Amino acid sequence: MTPTSGPTAGGTTVTLTGTGLATASAVRFGATPAASFTVVSDTHITAVAPAGTGTVPVTVTTSGGTSNGISYTYSAAPILSGVSPTQGPTSGGNTVTLTGANLTGATAVTFGATPATSFTVVSPTQITAVVPAATAGPIGVTVTTPGGTSTLPSAYFYVSTPVLTGVAPPSGPLSGGNTVTLTGVHLIEATAVRFGTTAASAFTVVSDTQITAVVPAGAAGLTDVTVSTAGGTSNAASYTYLPAPVVTTLIPSQGPASGGITFTLTGTNLAQATTVLVGGAPAGFTVVSDSHIVVDTLPGAAGPVTVTVTTPGGTSAPKTYTRVGSPGI
């Protein structure tokens, strides 16, 4: 007999095979007559199952008597109540867990109209399924058993892979703690932001195209910044960890209080200089190399003043420049 099970509502057409069936006068599912039956040949009968419950013997009666019984099981309709997780990448390949009732004997799991790549019936209340690929957006999930079908509309959401287009500012100190803005698309579902393999100290999803993140500490040099969502992990954008500038000499170390001359700073990590302060006031400067900066002196009161250099990597320790007053007679 094929199939050997069907819904409690009946209506399933089954094929009975055997011998001596040509003169069949009745087909019964337990004590209930088939809704209808057709004798195809002496070895085949098709019958429409009536409504019923449980497992019952199917018998054929002819003028020669009643046959042995073949078991037919009435299966309750499946009930699908949940999908977890509820979202994943458009490429598919991830595993989800379907929960509900009467899931034993499932013959199909579909996402929209597409069959699951594979599925396993774990118990009457649980199925695990490998999600197929699809376009971004919500989709219904359906489970089919001999007892019928159950669909959860828009139960699963396909998420596009995030794309990063920029990080601003693109550099900062080794100690981290500064905030950067990541731009791109498909960022709204972000679950992680990483600098290399280190998670951002914190991040905020501003919109589908923007995230702000607090940079963790890192080693000097370039590192990859990535964003992860249920849709996958983005391409890498570059961020540079810069060591703090170091000023070792200031030549000449003194000059007229009226300004109008230049002095040269030597040291390391000076190439990214954004500000030079002389006595707390911004001075004009020219970056000659990573180890040299030429600074325009500012007029001011006679006496010593501090000189510092600031880059995205931090601010140097102060050096002293002395303003010398004009001689008087």
What does each of the following model-derived ranges do?
Residues 2, 41, 123, 207, ...:
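Residue-level recognition of beta-strand termini and adjacent short loop/turns
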Residues 55-57, 95, 138-140, 222-224, ...:
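Short, conserved beta-strand segments of beta-strand-rich sandwich/propeller modules, principally
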